[in-house]
From Swiss-Prot:
Binding site for 2-[(2R,5Z)-2-carboxy-4-methylthiazol-5(2H)-ylidene]ethyl phosphate: T136, G137, T138, G166, V186, S187
GO biological process, one term: thiamine diphosphate biosynthetic process
Entry EC number(s): 2.5.1.3
Pathway the protein acts in: Cofactor biosynthesis; thiamine diphosphate biosynthesis; thiamine phosphate from 4-amino-2-methyl-5-diphosphomethylpyrimidine and 4-methyl-5-(2-phosphoethyl)-thiazole: step 1/1
Necessary cofactors: Mg(2+)
Domain of life: Bacteria
Listed name of the protein: Thiamine-phosphate synthase
UniProt remark on cofactor binding: Binds 1 Mg(2+) ion per subunit.
PANTHER family: THIAMINE BIOSYNTHETIC BIFUNCTIONAL ENZYME, THIAMINE-PHOSPHATE PYROPHOSPHORYLASE
Source lineage: Bacteria, Bacillati, Bacillota, Clostridia, Eubacteriales
InterPro entries, alphabetized: Aldolase_TIM, ThiamineP_synth_sf, ThiamineP_synth_TenI, TMP_synthase
GO molecular function: magnesium ion binding; thiamine-phosphate diphosphorylase activity
Length: 210
């Protein structure tokens, strides 16, 4: 399964921004609109609530055969048997996480520059999330990555590259000359009134540059 992952439209959840009553509803609407990968990101809730939420979201992702990635929490990812885990530079080292989760699970690593990207590849990551490409309200402490840095990363790593940070419909064309594999999106999907329509439009714009 790992080699056939479609990274095109990668929803990263944020319950503080969601336009729906429940996270499950937001996730399902995004999948119906064409989301190809879901990352469950829960920074504020207890471990118990994160676990319960992950089980609910997994039911939806399984229904549509969409991979579920857990942000940061290796224990939650293993507890619910998620498809993978995404870690940042301040989380557990990627080599340690790979040894814990094994080779069959997806391992994603955030990378803000070429050195971090090359290290993630050496540490056996399956993909990297590069950014923040633009300033973003969801991660106020994120340092930005330039287009030239992104281009160099895509030329020097041999794994899928997903961009993140302030991505919206209007900005997708900025990546036309760069060989990226997907868009990791938060507010441009989950905060929209019509999540399904917003996701569909993002996917249409992404395919225009592929």
């Amino acid at each position: 399964m790992k080699n056939k992952i479609d990274y095109s439209i990668y929803l990263v959840t944020d319950r503080d921004l969601m336009s729906t009553n429940t996270l499950e509803e937001a996730v399902e609407k995004s999948i119906l609109g064409g989301a190809t990968l879901i990352q469950l990101r829960e920074k504020e809730c207890s471990s118990h609530d994160f676990y319960e939420t992950a089980l609910k979201i997994k039911k939806i992702t399984q229904k549509y055969n969409i991979p579920l990635i857990i942000n940061d929490r290796v224990d939650i990812a293993l507890a619910v048997d998620a498809d993978g885990i995404h870690i940042g530079q301040s989380d557990l080292p990627a080599t340690v996480v790979r040894n814990i989760i094994g080779e069959d699970k997806i391992l994603g690593v955030s990378a803000g520059n070429l050195d971090e990207a090359l290290k993630a590849q050496k540490d056996r990551a399956d993909y990297i999330g590069v950014g923040a490409m633009y300033s973003t309200g969801t991660k106020k402490d994120a340092t930005s990555t330039t287009m030239s840095e992104l281009k160099e990363i895509t030329q020097k790593v041999s794994m899928p590259v997903v961009v993140i940070g302030g991505i919206n419909k209007e900005r997708i064309k900025d990546f036309k000359e760069i060989n990226i594999d997907g868009l990791a999106i938060v507010s441009a999907i989950i905060a929209q009134k019509d999540i399904e329509k917003a996701t569909r439009e993002l996917k249409e714009e992404f395919y225009k540059i592929k």
